[in-house]
Amino acid sequence: MGETEGKKEEADYKRLQTFPLVRHSDMPEEMRVETMELCVTACEKFSNNNESAAKMIKETMDKKFGSSWHVVIGEGFGFEITHEVKNLLYLYFGGTLAVCVWKCS
């Protein structure tokens, strides 16, 4: 029975690590969900290269929602930005990886 409990805890931990935790967003619901899914896809696809993940997110956001999107991905950064209203998403993915996506033209 102890082995079964251990596997369940491990599965719960893995699910928590792959679920995006939104820290702040002022995006409309539909845009926020789409952007979250894009961030998860990019971070999983380029798990060892944050620069490539950020480039994928930026280029996709530019195509879908117009130009002037910016993306920062990393594990240790602070930020103070100017952004357009209803165009900011800040989330954590994988436990420690932070993603900030915003539009500023």
From Swiss-Prot:
GO cellular component terms given for this protein: cilium; cytoplasm; dynein complex; microtubule
Domain of life where this protein originates: Eukaryota
Xref: InterPro entries: DLC_sf, Dynein_light_chain_typ-1/2
Molecular-function annotations in GO: identical protein binding
GO biological process, one term: microtubule-based process
Gene3D superfamilies: Protein Inhibitor Of Neuronal Nitric Oxide Synthase (3.30.740.10)
Function: Force generating protein of respiratory cilia. Produces force towards the minus ends of microtubules. Dynein has ATPase activity.
Record-given protein name: Dynein axonemal light chain 4
Organism: Mus musculus (Mouse)
Gene name for this UniProt entry: Dnal4
